[in-house]
């Protein structure tokens, strides 16, 4: 059964023209991981939230599994992971199964030129050293050493 939660000024019906007091249209955005077949939110923006500048080839972050049935004990030197400029390229997967992927990363730069969305999984980032700001629809979230950053699946963000 559908559950509705109203926050702020919204139209009486969904998916209709909705204008502010000056007659300007609000932009409607559907936020969901499975479209209308799942739980979703309709968000209304004063300004258009996105503008597609270009569509690039899909970027896979799926790990390459070197030893699919490996049960050997291992010791990892996480603070010695090689630093790389790009956030996505810097992620090195250590362990993976059908439910979870554990990676280490040492990005040198922030994601200034792009936003990223993981459409298939939630992300949890533990910050061992450093800090920054995550920009998303939820606002700007500052993080620092010792923080966990939880990013729900389908969230468009920039670090």
PLM regions: where:
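An N-terminus-focused feature that recognizes amino-terminal "leader" regions
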Residues: 1-158
């Amino acid at each position: 059964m559908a559950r509705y939660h109203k926050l702020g000024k919204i139209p009486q019906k969904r998916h209709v023209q909705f204008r502010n007091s000056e007659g300007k249209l609000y932009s409607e955005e559907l936020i969901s991981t499975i479209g209308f077949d799942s739980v979703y939110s309709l968000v209304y923006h004063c300004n258009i939230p996105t503008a597609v500048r270009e569509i690039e080839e899909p970027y896979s972050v799926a790990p390459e599994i070197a030893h699919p049935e490996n049960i050997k004990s291992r010791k990892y030197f996480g603070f010695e992971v090689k630093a790389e400029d790009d956030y996505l390229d810097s992620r090195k997967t250590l362990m993976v199964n059908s439910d979870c992927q554990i990676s280490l990363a040492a990005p040198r730069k922030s994601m200034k030129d792009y936003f990223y969305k993981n459409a298939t999984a939630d992300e949890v980032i533990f910050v061992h050293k450093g800090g920054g700001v995550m920009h998303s629809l939820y606002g700007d979230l500052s993080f620092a050493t010792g923080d966990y950053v939880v990013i729900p699946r389908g969230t468009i963000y920039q670090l």
